[in-house]
A protein has these predicted regions:
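Short, flexible, mixed-charge glycine/proline-rich loop motifs
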Residues: 145-157, 170-175
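Conserved phosphate/anionic-ligand binding catalytic regions in large, soluble enzymes, centered on
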Residues: 14-32
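Short Cys/His-rich Zn2+-coordinating modules
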Residues: 136-148, 162-167
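Short, non-ligating residues that shape and space the ligands of small metal-coordination modules
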Residues: 169-170, 190-191
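Cysteine-rich micro-motifs
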Residues: 174-187
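Short, hydrophobic/aliphatic alpha-helical segments
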Residues: 1-14, 163
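Short cysteine-rich clusters marking metal-coordination/redox-active sites
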Residues: 160-164, 181-184
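A structural-propensity feature for long, helix-poor, extended segments
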Residues: 48-79, 84-88
Length: 193
C-alpha cells in the first residue's frame, strides 16, 4: 500500500481537486483493507475485493484510488443511501466490513485545528491526523452476492421485447410473459421526449 500523501496526489488527479471528502474516502478504504488483511489491492489481491459505496460524493471518488475497484470492472457497487460509508467484501474469505464516517469527526477537526478558519482545510487537516476510531465506526457484515454480481460474470444477454435494447447481468424484468428492460417496465430515471 502507498502512503496517505501518495494516495492524496492520485485522488486529486482522479477527482480534479483535493478536499476533506477525498481524505475521508482514502482513510476509509485504507482502514477497510487493513481490517480485511488485504495488502496489495492493485497487485496480488486485486481480484479479492468488491466494494459497495453508499454516497455519490467526493469520498466515493477516493475509495477506488486505494482499492482498485472500478464500476467497469464490476468490483465497485453503488447503493445510494446518502451515507459516507462503504462495505469492503473479501471474496476469498467471504468476510465483509462496513465502515462509516462518524459525524462527530467534523467537531473534532474544529477542536484539533481551531486556528484554521476554512472549514474544508480544517477538516482536511483533522482527517489526516485523527485516530481511525475517531473517524470511523465499523461493523462486520455479511453481503450475499448472486453470481451475476461478481466481476467476470458472463451471463446470457437478453433483448427487451419493447425497445429492442440489450440487457446484461440478469437485469431484465418479466411482465406478462414478456422480457423487458427495467426502463420499459417503468423504472426509468428519465422521461422520453
Amino acid at each position: 500500500m502507498r502512503t496517505l500523501a501518495e494516495y492524496e496526489e492520485l485522488a486529486a488527479a482522479a477527482h480534479g481537486h483535493l478536499c476533506a471528502g477525498q481524505i475521508l474516502g482514502l482513510r476509509m478504504a485504507i482502514f477497510g483493507l487493513e481490517l480485511l488483511g488485504i495488502q496489495e489491492p492493485e497487485g496480488k489481491d486485486r481480484k479479492r475485493l468488491v466494494t459497495f459505496v453508499e454516497i455519490d460524493r467526493c469520498a466515493t471518488d477516493a475509495i477506488p484510488v486505494v482499492t482498485g475497484c472500478r464500476l467497469g470492472k464490476r468490483a465497485l457497487k453503488f447503493r445510494d443511501f446518502g451515507k459516507v460509508a462503504a462495505t469492503f467484501c473479501d471474496l476469498e474469505t467471504a468476510r465483509a466490513v462496513r465502515v462509516a464516517a462518524r459525524e462527530s469527526s467534523k467537531a473534532l477537526a474544529r477542536e484539533l485545528f481551531p486556528e484554521i478558519c476554512n472549514r474544508n482545510e480544517q477538516q482536511m487537516q483533522g482527517y489526516r491526523v485523527m485516530r481511525v476510531e475517531d473517524l470511523f465506526a465499523h461493523q462486520w457484515v455479511r453481503v450475499e452476492l448472486g453470481p451475476e454480481e461478481f466481476p467476470g460474470y458472463k451471463g446470457a444477454r437478453r433483448v427487451c421485447e419493447e425497445c429492442g435494447e440489450g440487457i446484461s447481468f440478469e437485469r431484465q424484468v418479466v411482465e406478462n410473459g414478456r422480457t423487458l428492460c427495467r426502463h420499459c417496465a417503468g423504472a426509468r430515471y428519465y422521461t422520453p421526449l
